[in-house]
């Protein structure tokens, strides 16, 4: 549940200043959670989506917690960075892939629906190229109650998406089939889903706890993403328009808030050096150009 706060007196001045070119406002003084309040209230006053950029993961997680409190968790998304790149031999953790893929899914849907999401990320996440929105949507499997789909074709599609057939669903990426019941643990979900079929028709969709098999809620529609973001990126990296900056998922009226710009710039240069020449990572100049079309607020505790 969102917590209602009295609007800061500076918000009117900030929103008026953002109406004038070059659509950038420097705000000096707020610290800690006050920065999140400024961002949330400015986005609300302007009725715009928000992209909040931080120097690092710890800062981003703190801002995410703040915004989830102020605006409601259902409106806020965290986009963590890969701890390893797609070109590395190691695979990223499922938790990071799940959060990244779910945020991309939500952004892809929000752009069509006009939903105003508040997205928080470290600068490292912005520098890492993502699957182009078009390709993510093309590879997304949508299933809803009342839909008719052949069970064999469904299983074939899930296998192509990288899911593994198991006797029982326990981990993300698992799928099991028992008669007219199909259990799927989507990579972007916290809990698996149970699809009950009558013939080829989906009669019900329920979330359930894998340990107890207890149902915890009904769903009308589920979107299932490819099991591996790494495989998706690798497959599309040589395709023209296969990868893009995350900013391409954002509406033109997005408000970008940069927390402590010097620290963000310093971290961006560190990432550049670490990934020099890697096609999965943009330079700061490229990233800056990608967000230049958005109105911006730069926050600093001291001048």
Task: Mark where each language-model region is.
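ASCE RecA-like P-loop NTPase motor cores
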Residues: 1-303
